[in-house]
Amino acid sequence: MSLRIILKREFSQCIRVLESGSKSPTIANRFQAQYGNKNNNSKRNTANNGTGNGNRFHNKYNNESRRPYPKTKYQQQQQQQQQQRKPQQHQQYIIDPRKIKFDNGTESARNAIEEIINRVYQLQRNYQIQLITDSGLKKCHLSEILQKLDLSINGLQLIDKSTTTTATTTTPTTNTSDEDLPLIKIITVRDMINQYSTYLNNLKQLELIKLGSSKTLKTLDIKLKLEQKKSTTKEILMKWSINNNDFKLQKTNEIKKLINNNGGNGKSFLINMVYNKRNTNKPIDTIFKRRSNTEEDEQELIEIELQRRQLLIENLQSLLTELNCKWTIEGDINTKMTFNVTPKGQPTTIEPSTTTNIVDEEVEDYNNNNNDDDGDCDEKKMNRTERKKRKSEQQKQKQKQKQQSKTNTNSNTAKEEDLDALYSFKIED
């Protein structure tokens, strides 16, 4: 019983001590009461001063508040180069254009693309180019275009710059300036193959010239002469749909001016009769497909158009005969016709009938004055009357010919007007 009482007293004292320790931590935790104040004071000092008072080296060599030294020119150049290289870091992962393989397209198209890639490499080793677009020039890499290209439809064209061909063909460059970059344009595959074939032909001709073949030299001379003639020869473009009035007023004056400017020295010129400037070789069958609903209407329109074209050709031939010109015809009435015209001499502006009459009268008067003393008066009078009769008969014949020509021209104009009216009426229907 006594032990139980003692234990209960001690247990109750322990509980009291614990309750008093929870209320006052200084009494319960002597170590915290002794050493906790020192730690709190050190934290307060560091917060007030920013750094500990005891760390002299930290206060002496603190570089946060100090301004940096100014950079040298070399350091500035390095910084600029690093900034320029940052946007170009993705170029390291671009595919080499020579490693790109095309699944579509013919062998000739692939060979042409390979040739263009090699020529671009000779001009610019990093394959940086300028692409010609509708909005303008665009700087890009050649592989970006080749990956999106469909060889069955489109191709590429390398445009030579006249100012930089001599410098770039000999030594390849790696400059990224826009002026030195090669120009590339997207075109059709057919045009690319044609350009590639002409390029190969020129290479073969150069090889033959180096070997010393005379045939190639002759052919080149002939080609150069033909090109010079084409450049010098002038052309007159005439549409099939021209009216009769426009032909008489405009085109006749153009042809006469061209002959007068040449001076009638025999310089040839061309008259191209086409459907349109854009569609020069458009066939007559394809003109009326959209306009006519049935085949019969289409055939009627084609027949009317052929008659109009035939009359236009006849009028042009009659005009060339009046101007004393020779011509040769090439082409077809269904698509395109070219008149290669060469004038024989200078065009006559004054009518010959008036000049001949004046000269004949002067000669007759001179002869009559000289023969007054030798012949009889009756014979002179008879000769004069006969001559007057002949002159009057000749003048009457000329007037009849003029009237016939006028009637023919009027009939031709009436025919053309009728054909134009039929043509417009059919189109409206």
From Swiss-Prot:
Residues 36-50, 75-91, 404-413 have a biased composition (Low complexity). Residues 365-377 have a biased composition (Acidic residues). It is found in: Mitochondrion. It comes from the Eukaryota. GO terms for cellular component: mitochondrion. Residues 386-403 have a biased composition (Basic residues). Residues 1-18 form a transit peptide. Keywords: Mitochondrion, Transit peptide. Residues 34-91, 365-429 are annotated as: Disordered. Belongs to the AIM23 family. This is Altered inheritance of mitochondria protein 23, mitochondrial. The lineage of its organism: Eukaryota, Fungi, Dikarya, Ascomycota, Saccharomycotina. The gene is AIM23.
